[in-house]
Structure formats: structure tokens, C-alpha cells
Amino acid sequence: MGQKVHPNGIRLGIVKPWNSTWYANTKEFADNLDSDFKVRKYLTKELEKASVSRIVIERPAKSIRVTIHTARPGIVIGKKGEDVEKLRKVVADIAGVPAQINIAEVRKPELDAKLVADSITSQLERRVMFRRAMKRAVQNAMRLGAKGIKVEVSGRLGGAEIARTEWYREGRVPLHTLRADIDYNTSEAHTTYGVIGVKVWIFKGEILGGMAAVEQPEKPSAQPKKQQRKGRK
């Protein structure tokens, strides 16, 4: 039986950046890794309803910088920035160094695999039919410009006695093409019948130029030159 390699793991350093970007010596490495895990666990639990896509952690010069990618930045920031300040203090206590928290807005949540998987999960927990939830996610992604999407759910679908797996796919999802920008993520729906697993693959196009093209900051659009007005004769 054929097995699939993790689509994100195989593309790290080719077209996918790491979620933790820091260097440490042998003594500090384990402590940093442990605090990264605890910070992510705390933020994921605290921001459960804030549609968090991913959490990126950097460690510049004895401090920690956390970037939260979310589709609902208002919930993370809170009234007058109170909530984000509370998060900053807790993260600083966990990491043991000064903390800085940045918020990055996810403009198109329909094209983010984690947010799509969480959306399907919440619908399944509200007893929406799994086929309807899957088809809606596929249609929304294709409408907003995805080159391809595959959605898979597995478990006691519809309360069936025997667990099974069902999936929908539209467009192309080339898992073997390393330069393909494929966003993959999973989620779990805890229903009265048991746990239903959700997997989402979204193909957004091919990245030519490798990591240099991914990390290159967007250049500001050149302003059109003002046309000189001709003098009247």
C-alpha cells in the first residue's frame, strides 16, 4: 500500500520556510525547542476562536519574536491592544526572555489549508453533512484562484457503524513536484460518534527560483510618471 510523504516537510528549504527560525548551541537548543512547543501550545489554546493559521517564532539577540498569522486580527489584538499585551507577558514568562508579538493578517482564509480544515471541522461538530462541508470548501477555494484542492475526511461519517474515508478533488494537486506550492494541514472534529479526521491539500501554483523567490520582499509598485501638460499655443 503506497504511503505519502508529508507535503510540507519534503519542501522545507526548497519552497517552504521553517516555522521556527533561530540558531542555538548544544546547551540551549533543547530549552529553546521546549519553550517553542509551550508557546505554540499556549497560543493555540488561547486563540482557538481567532482563526490562527500558523505561528512563526524567531529569537534575535536574547529575545523572542512571535508572528501570529490570523484571519481575525481584531480578536487577537483586543480592545486597545489589551489582549495582545496579555499574550506578550505570558509568552515572555514561558520563554524567560523579553517577547515581541506581531500580527499578520491572512487575506484569503479560503486558500489556507489550516483554516479550511478548521472550518470543515467546526461544521462537522455542528452536525452539517460532511459532503456539503467538503464541497463548499472545494468550491470556495477554486473560486478564489486555487489551482487545485483535495479534501479528505475519515472516521464514522454520518454516524456509520464502520469507519471509512471519503475525499473530493478539483484541479491539480501535484505532490511529487517539489517546486509546487502546496499548503497541507489537518484537523480533528470531535463528534458524538467519535473523532473525524480532516486533511486538506491546496495547490497555489509553482514557485520558480526556490527560497529566494519566497523570501523576497514585495517591491513597492512603481508610481506612474506625471505627464507634463503641453502649453497652449
Curated annotation (Swiss-Prot):
Keywords: Ribonucleoprotein, Ribosomal protein, RNA-binding, rRNA-binding. InterPro entries: KH_dom (IPR004087), KH_dom-like_a/b (IPR015946), KH_dom_type_2 (IPR004044), KH_sf_prok-type (IPR009019), Ribosomal_S3_C_sf (IPR036419), Ribosomal_uS3_bac-typ (IPR005704), Ribosomal_uS3_C (IPR001351), Ribosomal_uS3_CS (IPR018280). GO terms for molecular function: mRNA binding; rRNA binding; structural constituent of ribosome. The keyword RNA-binding applies. Residues 214-233 are annotated as: Disordered. The keyword Kinase does not apply. GO terms for cellular component: cytosolic small ribosomal subunit. Part of the 30S ribosomal subunit. Forms a tight complex with proteins S10 and S14. NCBIfam families: rpsC_bact. PANTHER family: 30S/40S RIBOSOMAL PROTEIN S3, SMALL RIBOSOMAL SUBUNIT PROTEIN US3C. This is Small ribosomal subunit protein uS3. The lineage of its organism: Bacteria, Pseudomonadati, Pseudomonadota, Gammaproteobacteria, Enterobacterales. The gene is rpsC.
